[in-house]
Amino acid sequence: MSKYMGGKEASSVLGVHQRTLYQWDKKGWIKTIRTKGGKRLYDVGSYLADKDEESKEDHKLSICYVRVSSNSQKDDLERQIKFMKKKYPNHTIIKDISSGINMNRKGLNKIIDLAIEGRIKEVVVAYKDRLAIFGFSLIERLIETYSDGKIVVVRKKENQEPQEELIEDMMDVMNVFTARRNGSRKYSNK
């Protein structure tokens, strides 16, 4: 949408002085055209559309997501939080204490809700499995599609073959089910 206006009208619409418009033109902040007589016409429509896009971006959140599996790992959770705050001081921290297989986590649900609302700029995780052992690519797609955001994995496992990744996923699943079985056995023996 481009709507060109003279200096007086443009300054009235934008709420700035005509000299300010002239400075913005010199800096390239607003598009202008010149009439044959040399009068400047300002593209107020495009300027307002650009500002609207910028304000939408300003409302998007940058999030650091941290997670541990159990309350006994709270020390690790605190280390993750400390690391993320140091490396990403302007990000919001969202934390969970729950299994990576459990997709019904309070923090994860909040991230999904924010993504669907289009309010996520980026989500930073230490490792992919901190966000989700299974379904990482689904969450990534939600964030990309609805929020035009991204997931940043800080510590990637370099040059991992697909077979190695599959074996690692299977080991994660086995560990979770073993821990659940041993945990339930522990309580039944009491």
Curated annotation (Swiss-Prot):
- What are the BP-aspect GO terms? DNA integration; regulation of DNA-templated transcription
Q: Keywords of this protein's UniProt record, alphabetized?
A: Coiled coil, DNA integration, DNA recombination, DNA-binding
Q: Which domain of life is it from?
A: Viruses
Q: Which residues form the active site?
A: 69
DNA-binding residue intervals: 11-30
Q: Which InterPro entries match?
A: DNA-bd_dom_put_sf (IPR009061), MerR-type_HTH_dom (IPR000551), Recombinase/Transposase-rel (IPR051491), Recombinase_CS (IPR006118), Resolv_N (IPR006119), Resolvase-like_N_sf (IPR036162), Transpos_IS607 (IPR048046)
Disulfide pairs here are none
| Resolvase/invertase-type recombinase catalytic domain mapped to chain residues | 61-190
Coiled coil where?
A: 67-92
Pfam name, any one: MerR
One annotated GO molecular function is: DNA binding
Q: Where are the transmembrane segments?
A: none
- Provide the function of this protein: Resolvase catalyzes the resolution (a site-specific recombination) of the cointegrated replicon to yield the final transposition products.
Per the record, the similarity remark reads: Belongs to the site-specific recombinase resolvase family.
The protein in question is named: Putative resolvase R80
What is the organism field in this record? Acanthamoeba polyphaga mimivirus
